[in-house]
Amino acid sequence: MSRQAKDDFLRHYTVSDPRTHPKGYTEYKVTAQFISKKDPEDVKEVVVWKRYSDFRKLHGDLAYTHRNLFRRLEEFPAFPRAQVFGRFEASVIEERRKGAEDLLRFTVHIPALNNSPQLKEFFRGGEVTRPLEVSRDLHILPPPLIPTPPPDDPRLSQLLPAERRGLEELEVPVDPPPSSPAQEALDLLFNCESTEEASGSPARGPLTEAELALFDPFSKEEGAAPSPTHVAELATMEVESARLDQEPWEPGGQEEEEDGEGGPTPAYLSQATELITQALRDEKAGAYAAALQGYRDGVHVLLQGVPSDPLPARQEGVKKKAAEYLKRAEEILRLHLSQLPP
């Protein structure tokens, strides 16, 4: 795939038409338009329906990527917080719709975001269409000259097998099955090859929902500094998993399965404990640069390990502790390292 593909289109995103899914949550129509720079009439369109948790996951993924780009001149857009009460009110639905639309439009001028695998995955399953061509076809097609009899018309029995087969093909539209050409069309719209802007960032797959708010600077609650017992809590988390808060990631919105088979303590917890223990020692000794790196490494290990953790309760605990460690790392950067030369 050519690296120039990322410059071939102008992108335009809209989020509209909120509706209630049969399962009870709200979903939004997301439309991505790709307008060719060479031919403005060459417009491709992808439409998908997404819920709040999908947008929130994408926000966390893109926030992580944006932070690694070190683009300090632009502020990554905020996203509405999850809430238990009032999430079906018109004002909340509109706030979420606008937040999702602002997020997508923010990516337009940043190649590392608008060509990211996370954004491509977000639109996976949507059909790539050419709305202008469909509109032109509607004007040039002549009206049918002979009315088609209904399917239960007794005259159908008098048709020859070949005629019946041809008539049924006209009456029953056949949806094209997922095919490689459709996937290739999506690949052409989202050029996921590495760009110069993102070349310094380590390669990683899309974040899971468990990683959602941890790298999102707008999703952490303000509060007191982390407790000095963080490491002890992390080391004993497998014992306390039954007592951890198990509130759902999107309150009242998703169906989660509980897994009671925890098994032995995951290795990633032990590794993260060692890293964060050393980070606490470095911070106490005034070695703030080493402490900052230690917290970041510890959080990275937690986020890599938590998706495969068999205990949902422990996953929630890991997410909360990782958020605290990341917040502590940001405090060290702000209080002790912000004045250092680049």
Swiss-Prot record:
InterPro entries: Intracell_Sig-Traffick_Protein, MIT_dom, MIT_dom_sf, PX_dom, PX_dom_sf. GO terms for biological process: intracellular protein transport. Residues 265-342 form the MIT domain. It is a peripheral membrane protein. The modification Phosphoserine is found at residues 201, 227. It is found in: Cytoplasm; Membrane; Cytoplasmic vesicle membrane. GO terms for cellular component: cytoplasmic vesicle membrane; cytosol; intracellular membrane-bounded organelle; membrane; nucleolus; plasma membrane. One of its GO terms (molecular function) is phosphatidylinositol binding. Residues 245-267 are annotated as: Disordered. CDD domains: MIT_SNX15. Keywords: Cytoplasm, Cytoplasmic vesicle, Lipid-binding, Membrane, Methylation, Phosphoprotein, Protein transport, Transport. The modification Omega-N-methylarginine is found at residue 105. Homodimer. Interacts with SNX1, SNX2 and SNX4. Belongs to the sorting nexin family. May be involved in several stages of intracellular trafficking. Overexpression of SNX15 disrupts the normal trafficking of proteins from the plasma membrane to recycling endosomes or the TGN. The PX domain mediates interaction with membranes enriched in phosphatidylinositol 3-phosphate. This is Sorting nexin-15.
